[in-house]
Amino acid sequence: MHRVRRLHKPMIYVIGCGGTGSHVVNQIVDVHSAMVNQGHEGVSVRAFDGDSVAYSNVGRQAFYLQDVGQPKSKVLIERINMHYGLNWSHRGNLMRKEQIRADIIVSCVDTKASRKTIKSADMNDNTYIIECGNARSSGQVILGQHKGDLPNPYDEHPALTKGKEPKGEGCLDPYYKQDLPVNRQVAVYVQQIIWNLLRKHELSHRGVFFDLAQFASNGVQTTERRSA
């Protein structure tokens, strides 16, 4: 079990607003609305992505034809702010060794270099990191902490940041070599983890590995970081 520290209107960074991140942002605003409706303060979000919307993104990612050519993080956040009366923020890419003031980081990037940038950032030891990834029909969502009680996802799974970049276009694939629902499924699991962090005092599970083609999933039980 992991005892969750109480988070008051947490700041959530969503890093990467493509195939997974664009859906994650929309899932988080649902969490915010549900929390506010129950008398809580909700959450704040800052979205990061340096890319612009392409025609090939429409359909797989949470964008519309009129968004083409616009910065991804900008169009997502401005749409949410307009419809929900919020003041969430957006910007381009996260910089290496950047100072982070987030309670929760959701990593929706698809390169080792981008994950290294997140790992190198200056953040609080207890910052929660939700690491997302997917392949053709499978994916994983893992919750950890920078240097807190839960393992850091990048130390726990070194292959996320070490070695050569895999070949292929990842989530940017315009030819739908990945199953269409896979990014949305990752986003749903992210929503569940954030909901648990905000609504529960203890976590028995902190992630999942799934395969949509096999209709299979395996939860990751919570284990505390071992002392040296």
State each model region's role.
Residues 1-20, 24, 100-101, 112-115, ...:
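Glycine-rich phosphate/adenylate-binding loop
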Residues 8-38, 46-54:
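Glycine-rich adenosine-cofactor-binding loop
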Residues 10, 41-45, 88, 127:
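Residue-level recognition of the N-termini of beta-strands and the immediately preceding loop/turn
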Residues 41-84:
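Glycine-rich phosphate-binding loop and adjoining beta1-alpha1-beta2 segment
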Residues 106-107, 130:
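N-terminal Rossmann-like NAD(P) cofactor-binding module of classical short-chain dehydrogenase/reductase
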